[in-house]
């Protein structure tokens, strides 16, 4: 199952459009057509089953057919981890934390940390990609770094 993400949809939404990049990916790369079924999440535990109503290169509009809400975990898992010198190791950690269902991640800058600057935009994209690839319905919250 391919999972797509749109943070603006709610239980009351009936029709919505993907942004230009996501629309291009759906129509050009995945070659989806009108009446194809897509699964979309808003990162808050909802899984929406949708049908494509308009498929063009720059705009993909879908109609929500049904939705389900995943039961939240009994426990909230919050990890606070210092970024490593090699950025790819921290990115790998973010992917795995998302896949196992961590709810919140806080980078910690310690006295002897070799990495003092955190690229939160890049890390947010990694969390989003990991959520979609692992079919996870909850997007972890990435907090600002603390010292």
Where are these regions (language model features)?
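N-terminal positively charged helical leader segments and presequences
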Residues: 1-70, 121
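RNA substrate-binding interface of SAM-dependent RNA methyltransferases
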Residues: 71-147
């Amino acid at each position: 199952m391919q999972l797509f993400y749109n943070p603006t949809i709610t239980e009351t939404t009936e029709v919505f459009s993907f942004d230009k990049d996501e629309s291009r990916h759906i129509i050009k790369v995945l070659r989806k057509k009108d009446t194809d079924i897509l699964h979309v999440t808003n990162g808050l535990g909802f899984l929406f089953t949708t049908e494509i109503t308009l498929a063009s290169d720059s705009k993909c509009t879908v109609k929500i057919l049904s939705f389900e809400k995943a039961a939240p975990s009994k426990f909230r898992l919050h990890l606070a981890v210092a970024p490593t010198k090699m950025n790819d190791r921290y990115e790998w950690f973010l992917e795995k934390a998302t896949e196992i269902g961590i709810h919140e991640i806080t980078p910690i800058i310690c006295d002897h940390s070799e990495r003092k600057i955190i690229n939160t935009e890049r890390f947010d994209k990694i969390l989003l990609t990991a959520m979609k690839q692992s079919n996870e319905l909850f997007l972890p919250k990435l907090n600002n770094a603390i010292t």
